[in-house]
């Protein structure tokens, strides 16, 4: 233990953990870039997320099997929780995110999703009456001001589509925040890896069923580029970052891993500019600084009553 009472991390674990957390955050951020590239080939959100989940399903089933070895059998209550979390945390959050990316830039999408810790804070207050400190309130206001700054700039040239896209992505962030708030009990009982493997597998199946219900089978005929981009999305930007972040948390703890995630919005903006030729100007810089600073303060000061 350190003098401050926090657990000390061996230098080797600290370096490896920071590297894993950074790589995982960058890989997660690449998802929006790949989705935007795929949309250039005339595919829609329902079909695109179907292919992403089709290729991700075997990986998460394998993770669920590996994490379940020697573990107790799941009860009906466990399965109900897994299905519920799969719907909110992975199916609904993913679909709304993909849909929203049809209308807004990858940079704005990542900034909205990065508000997630503030949404968890608000849900904690609404559901459990956990107090929000004055510092956290100011930090949240700063974060949302940053998003509004970038949104206002984007709405000037995207029009009503920017409003729809931003609302869809914000809905995705809320859905994932609900998952985080309610997943605590199951994480303790099942373990993080087992829960992620099972809940994501549920979401994968739901995305496949959604395609069958909403689209003719002929809609599955897409450009080869969409297939390869979906494989890349499922592996490099979905499965791999989950593993990397979990390994990082084991080495450096959830708090430091979350703070390292600040690299996510910046990497998305950089990739958006370099790969998608998205705009980069003072509005985006200022908005990003506000969002990242506000979320850092929220995570830095923690949630009262959550420990």
Model regions and ranges:
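Transmembrane alpha-helical segments that form core, pore/gating elements
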Residues: 21, 36, 60, 120-122, ...
